[in-house]
């Protein structure tokens, strides 16, 4: 049987570069497992932090070391070229997190290449990345959410006379605590929990340095639960998992530092709540036009039984600590089986 050449694409220019490397390393291990080794050949392709694509031999070194490649100090303009091996790929497995990886830009390039790839297309990826657009789509789908406000960088930076009034409006509408987030970053990068006017002003300035679109959400006392989705037109939802942590909120350091957060799988919730979360996950998946895979995050207000959708991640992490593969393992699909199924789904979607 002829093996499929899987282009494992990782790295990238976002702040989640290191997460991408760790995810790619785990996927490469799963693709090399006995049940997959006879089906797939891995062709790793690494994108350096400056956006330069690196050939498989260099990419393999990065996978083995799990360390980013240093970028040249020479900043003179260069014309990046794809490694020639790119033309040998049968199916792409992109595992780039954040901007320029899961926001539709890379998906557009792969679509132009006319080669199958794992995950959502341009639309689903773009909607899933931009928190403001995502929330608009969720509202249209009738999915309940926390109260929020949207802002622009121009509102925060352009007129110092308007800024105090903007903060007044946030305080009156959302109160404290609230969360300030850049609209287009993942892994909690740039997010701040604020409890006072001074913290709010600082957080808004910080978020504006990351993105020109900012969202501010009301804080809610709730359990944080997540559900994984797998499939294309008839997707399935996994068991529900819960994240517990000792830090102030589920920030970048807590997410990716061993021992800082605990994943409880399955979550200890009533069966009716489990079913409702699964149904809402599938509704969110359809609403953004996702494909292949996604992880959907919720707030479960135990006191009232209310379930509020937080966000959908169309290219969730695949590190040793990541919720997505662990949810499917608890549902009965091992890591090697999961990556195999994702490749099958990519091929199916491409043939439609």
From Swiss-Prot:
Pathway: Cell wall biogenesis; peptidoglycan biosynthesis. Its EC number is 6.3.2.4. It comes from the Bacteria. It is found in: Cytoplasm. Binds 2 magnesium or manganese ions per subunit. Its cofactor is Mg(2+); Mn(2+). Mg(2+) 2 binds at residues 311, 313. One of its GO terms (cellular component) is cytosol. GO terms for molecular function: ATP binding; D-alanine-D-alanine ligase activity; metal ion binding. ATP binds at residues 171-226. Mg(2+) 1 binds at residues 297, 311. One of its GO terms (biological process) is cell wall organization. Keywords: ATP-binding, Cell shape, Cell wall biogenesis/degradation, Cytoplasm, Ligase, Magnesium, Manganese, Metal-binding, Nucleotide-binding, Peptidoglycan synthesis. InterPro entries: ATP-grasp, ATP_grasp_subdomain_1, D-Ala_lig_Van_CS, D_ala_D_ala, Dala_Dala_lig_C, Dala_Dala_lig_N, PreATP-grasp_dom_sf. Residues 135-344 form the ATP-grasp domain. Coiled coil: none annotated. It catalyses: 2 D-alanine + ATP = D-alanyl-D-alanine + ADP + phosphate + H(+). Cell wall formation. Belongs to the D-alanine--D-alanine ligase family. This is D-alanine--D-alanine ligase. It comes from Gloeothece citriformis (strain PCC 7424) (Cyanothece sp. (strain PCC 7424)). The lineage of its organism: Bacteria, Bacillati, Cyanobacteriota, Cyanophyceae, Oscillatoriophycideae.
């Amino acid at each position: 049987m002829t093996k499929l050449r899987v282009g494992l694409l990782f790295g990238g220019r976002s702040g989640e570069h290191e997460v991408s490397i760790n995810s790619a390393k785990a996927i490469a291990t799963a693709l090399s497992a006995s049940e997959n080794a006879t089906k797939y050949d891995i062709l790793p392709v690494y994108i350096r932090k400056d956006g330069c694509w690196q050939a498989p031999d260099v990419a393999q070194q990065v996978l083995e070391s799990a360390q980013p490649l240093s970028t040249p100090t020479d900043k003179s303009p260069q014309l990046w070229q794809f490694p020639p091996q790119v033309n040998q790929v049968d199916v792409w497995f992109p595992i780039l997190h954040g901007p320029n990886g899961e926001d539709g830009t890379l998906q557009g390039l792969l679509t132009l290449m006319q080669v199958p790839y794992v995950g959502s297309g341009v639309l689903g990826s773009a909607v899933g990345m931009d928190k403001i657009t995502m929330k608009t789509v969720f509202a249209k789908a009738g999915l309940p959410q926390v109260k929020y406000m949207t802002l622009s960088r121009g509102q925060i930076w352009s007129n110092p006379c308007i800024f105090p009034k903007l903060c007044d409006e946030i305080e009156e509408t959302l109160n404290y605590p609230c969360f300030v987030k850049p609209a287009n970053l993942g892994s909690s990068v740039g997010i701040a929990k604020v409890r006072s006017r001074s913290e709010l002003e600082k957080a808004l300035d910080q978020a504006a340095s990351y993105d020109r679109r900012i969202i501010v959400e009301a804080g809610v006392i709730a359990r944080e639960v997540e559900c994984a989705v797998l499939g294309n037109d008839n997707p399935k939802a996994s068991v529900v998992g819960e994240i517990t942590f000792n830090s102030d909120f589920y920030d970048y350091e807590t997410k990716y530092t061993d021992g800082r957060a605990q994943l409880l799988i399955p979550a200890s919730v009533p069966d009716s709540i489990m079913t409702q979360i699964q149904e809402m996950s599938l509704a969110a998946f359809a609403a953004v036009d996702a494909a292949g895979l996604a992880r959907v995050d919720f707030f479960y207000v135990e006191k009232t039984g209310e379930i509020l959708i937080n966000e959908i991640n169309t290219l969730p992490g695949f590190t040793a600590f990541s919720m997505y593969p662990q949810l499917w393992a608890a549902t009965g699909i091992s890591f090697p089986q999961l990556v195999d199924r994702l490749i099958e789904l990519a091929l199916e979607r491409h043939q439609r």
